[in-house]
Amino acid sequence: MTQLAIGKPAPLGAHYDGQGVNFTLFSVHAERVELCVFDANGQEHRYDLPGHSGDIWHGYLPDARPGLRYGYRVHGPWQPAEGHRFNPAKLLIDPCARQIDGEFKDNPLLHAGHNEPDYRDNAAIAPKCVVVVDHYDWEDDAPPRTPWGSTIIYEAHVKGLTYLHPEIPVEIRGTYKALGHPVMINYLKQLGITALELLPVAQFASEPRLQRMGLSNYWGYNPVAMFALHPAYACSPETALDEFRDAIKALHKAGIEVILDIVLNHSAELDLDGPLFSLRGIDNRSYYWIREDGDYHNWTGCGNTLNLSHPAVVDYASACLRYWVETCHVDGFRFDLAAVMGRTPEFRQDAPLFTAIQNCPVLSQVKLIAEPWDIAPGGYQVGNFPPLFAEWNDHFRDAARRFWLHYDLPLGAFAGRFAASSDVFKRNGRLPSAAINLVTAHDGFTLRDCVCFNHKHNEANGEENRDGTNNNYSNNHGKEGLGGTLDLVERRRDSIHALLTTLLLSQGTPMLLAGDEHGHSQHGNNNAYCQDNQLTWLDWSQASSGLTAFTAALIHLRKRIPALVENRWWEEGDGNVRWLNRYAQPLSTDEWQNGPKQLQILLSDRFLIAINATLEVTEIVLPAGEWHAIPPFAGEDNPVITAVWQGPAHGLCVFQR
């Protein structure tokens, strides 16, 4: 190969122009950067990057082609106390690599050293980057742009969703291709889903600790290459990008948006004892929040924290997000531990990354969802994100469970959460859709486990059941575990119905965990991040068709209720909502705080949710008018009820007049 030309300092990463490849890498503190390319025989060829524009190192390799494997060796000081951990003996991944060849195994050679550098060369076993071409024929693809008020989110894992689906071809189960298969798309459409939210698809690594136990990181919240698709979800790693885009194109044709769960808060390099893959060896002090002693601020619980207040790291994160939108046509993002995005180090609404997103004509137009906390002091920021963001509403989750499973929540608190938690989100011009309401998520009990287990059962995770939260607000209804008498099964079913109804008929944006509509159980494991097995894969052969139909009917009912889809805050007297007691009268102040758990919610003056969350059968006097129960609480032809509904214990019903 010829020598490197100077090339251009932008864009970041490796880009093929038809004649060769331009390489760029950011590093403030590097003293020298070597581009290492590998031929078909694995022979390494090294080139110093000749260009150095500001903090960007760059060079152009004529005649280089897509498929070229490469990495970097970065020279600089080894000064751990100052936060510098350069080690040119270690081959490093380009942070903007679009494809990775090789596996991130637990190997001592993939570590830089702790106090002293490990100068053993690792190029023979280190994963390599691959130059790719982004071109793709999108045909007439267009984003669905579903209004927030009409959005129904379905949180799913690429593999877990389809790996056991009997109607999907065996060879594509558990892959990106399966997401775009007609069977899966038809299912999502029939259910009423408008947005498929995928757990992380950017390439991730399994922690060495898990590998030593024979486990793996299943969820994917351990990123190593944020621009590259995780190859294990592809039928062929070389075609992963096209397989993913094929699926998105098919979902878009069906009117379904795709939202990516993205991890912009830490990397798979973990703590100082963790592996060296990329950022730590490129510019540790710039990419991460570093303490005065040279160690990491661990505001994520994962060993390190990305410094998203550094201008270059903001540019990197912004470029990553734009890549997924522009190259893959994704419709939005859910940001894991998103409080990190606003750290300066204190949390600010005008933090640099938030400002960059706000000012970006691409990113400001997609759906943005925050998990609004991290584990550091001041990390709980629910309701405090900039107006462009919606946020996971843990207030809703806890209130719904407490009301239906613990019976210890006043009506006033329940109603506040039902009304999109306006006390939290009605500020800065935000709409009710800013509240992402959920009862369950990937992290925690499944819906079925909420009604079958009082305690977590995480022994399979190898941490002696110490991991996972103990604050589940669950209720096993008298017996720990699945199964039981017919009466027990029916009481659990009623609780599931109540929780689903609360989720899907409340104001705000509902998010349904994949499998909850099946009755999927993880057998009490509320932290199944390392369980890539039948514990987490959805078993479609065991899915409850009745529960699926119930869920679909609720979603389609929601779409008929103007008060829920118009995305306007409810105001007294506007006809959107009336809160009534069991006698169809407005609730008194005392009833709101101390009254029995009986409530009628009249929506759009036509739809009535009658709730009896007590343990006794109770007569509920309906408002004036001719009412009939509607699906999924009754068939299509139902007798008119003009006066009283016999509310079963711990039950609810929806009527229309």
UniProtKB/Swiss-Prot annotation:
One of the entry's Gene Ontology molecular-function terms is: glycogen debranching enzyme activity
- Superkingdom, natural source: Bacteria
Which Pfam families does UniProt cross-reference here?
Answer: Alpha-amylase, CBM_48, GlgX_C
Q: Which SUPFAM superfamilies match?
A: (Trans)glycosidases (SSF51445), E set domains (SSF81296)
Q: Which UniProt keywords apply?
A: Carbohydrate metabolism, Glycogen metabolism, Glycosidase, Hydrolase
Q: Where is this site: Transition state stabilizer?
A: D443
Q: What SMART domains does UniProt report for this protein, alphabetically?
A: Aamy
Q: Name one GO biological process term.
A: glycogen catabolic process
Q: What is this protein called?
A: Glycogen debranching enzyme
Q: Which family does it belong to?
A: Belongs to the glycosyl hydrolase 13 family.
Pathway it belongs to? Glycan degradation; glycogen degradation
Which top EC class applies here?
hydrolase
- Cited HAMAP family: GlgX
**What is the stated purpose of this protein?**
Removes maltotriose and maltotetraose chains that are attached by 1,6-alpha-linkage to the limit dextrin main chain, generating a debranched limit dextrin.
Reaction catalyzed: Hydrolysis of (1->6)-alpha-D-glucosidic linkages to branches with degrees of polymerization of three or four glucose residues in limit dextrin
Q: Where do transmembrane segments lie in this chain?
A: none
Active-site residues annotated for this sequence? D336 (nucleophile), E371 (proton donor)
